[in-house]
A protein has these predicted regions:
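Active-site or ligand-binding cleft "flap/edge" segments
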Residues: 1-150
């Protein structure tokens, strides 16, 4: 498990992100991300969220920070944190189908754009966190992130 220093002074758990990529294409450089077990989605800066969805055929913005994409999308979103790349399962880029009777139709994206609570660039909720082992050490003010075994 990779141990990193908590970047937040506000009581959140935050990490320094080296880069964010969709498949092998970088969509964001160095930034900070809050790791939030109470959030389902990923909240990204608008420019990064637009780059992610522009690279997915059939993806569309709803004009209010949300996006839709084909439920058949198999792109992988990766976050490089302290030199270690953590890649999400492609299914976790899909939050939910718009029509539960059509699982091959349009899905709501697990990535939206917006402002985060402490000014961090990203907020990584369950869509990301279910792809890593995540541990916190409040005494040492450190965060552990580990890769899941297949």
């Amino acid at each position: 498990m990779n141990q990193v220093e908590n970047q937040s002074k506000e009581g959140y758990w935050a990490v320094q992100v080296d880069s964010v990529s969709l498949d092998s294409n970088q969509v964001s450089g160095s930034s900070t991300a809050v790791l939030d077990t109470g959030t389902s989605l990923i909240i990204a800066p608008k420019s990064a969220a637009d780059k992610i969805h522009d690279a997915i055929p059939g993806a569309k913005s709803d004009g209010h920070g949300g996006y839709t994409l084909p439920c058949t999308t198999r792109k992988k979103l990766s976050f490089k944190i302290s030199g270690t790349t953590h890649t999400m399962d492609s299914r976790d880029l899909l939050f939910a189908p718009k029509d539960s009777n059509n699982l091959k139709g349009t899905c709501i994206s697990a990535v939206s754009s917006g402002e985060t609570m402490d000014g961090a660039s990203w907020l990584l909720g369950a869509a990301f966190l279910k792809n890593v082992y995540f541990a916190t050490n409040s005494d040492a003010n450190r965060i552990g992130l580990g890769k899941l075994k297949n």
